[in-house]
Amino acid sequence: MAREGEGGRGRDREERDSEFMDRLVHINRVAKVVKGGRRFGFAALVVVGDQKGRVGFGHGKAREVPEAIRKATESAKRSLIRVPLREGRTLHHDVNGRHGAGRVVLRAAPAGTGIIAGGPMRAIFETLGMHDVVAKSQGSSNPYNMVRATFDALGRQDSPRAVAARRNLKVSVLQGRRPGGEAEAASEA
């Protein structure tokens, strides 16, 4: 048996959970019609992230709101993805994503811009740890479609290092920098 100060399964889980930030995106009341009337339940959509480039979303259903949120949070922690961030604050490149009739456009932004995004997208960027981004949603405004479209776009995000490795190039060549850089170009002019 675990004594105080030695840890234990429960405490380890609490420490692991403390590294994540979670946001409730949407709660939906649903009804099942039965012989005696209606039986109500709740569905929750939650976004979880570590504010260091990992984020996930989950969906939970239960008869009570807290239980639905707990299930959604656990589901979100199991579906975390890593998103490469430029300078730890924005995207490497502009990207589009879609799910169903929902489409999103995500754009990298200069420092100080902030998170310019509406609804569920803002929760995703805050839990991801992104500080500067401009996002636009088009088509469906259904929170589930918007979240999945945003994750589709974030999944298409590539770091320059990953692109260079895929093309068998050096990152400096990929970004158009040459040995010597601007000093060499200025001496030639």
From Swiss-Prot:
Q: What InterPro entries would the database entry show?
A: Ribosomal_Su5_D2-typ_SF, Ribosomal_uS5, Ribosomal_uS5_bac-type, Ribosomal_uS5_C, Ribosomal_uS5_N, Ribosomal_uS5_N_CS, Ribsml_uS5_D2-typ_fold_subgr
Any one Gene Ontology BP term:
translation
| One GO cellular component term | small ribosomal subunit
Q: Where is the S5 DRBM domain?
A: 20-83
**Example of a GO MF term:** structural constituent of ribosome
Q: Would you say which domain of life the source belongs to?
A: Bacteria
Q: Which Cys residues form disulphide pairs? A: none
Which key words tag this protein in UniProt? Ribonucleoprotein, Ribosomal protein, RNA-binding, rRNA-binding
* A family per Pfam: Ribosomal_S5_C
Coiled-coil residue spans: none
| Subunit structure as annotated in this protein's UniProt entry | Part of the 30S ribosomal subunit. Contacts proteins S4 and S8.
Q: Which purpose does this protein serve, as stated in its record? A: With S4 and S12 plays an important role in translational accuracy.
Give the domain note. Answer: The N-terminal domain interacts with the head of the 30S subunit; the C-terminal domain interacts with the body and contacts protein S4. The interaction surface between S4 and S5 is involved in control of translational fidelity.
* Family the UniProt entry places it in: Belongs to the universal ribosomal protein uS5 family.
Give the protein's recorded name: Small ribosomal subunit protein uS5
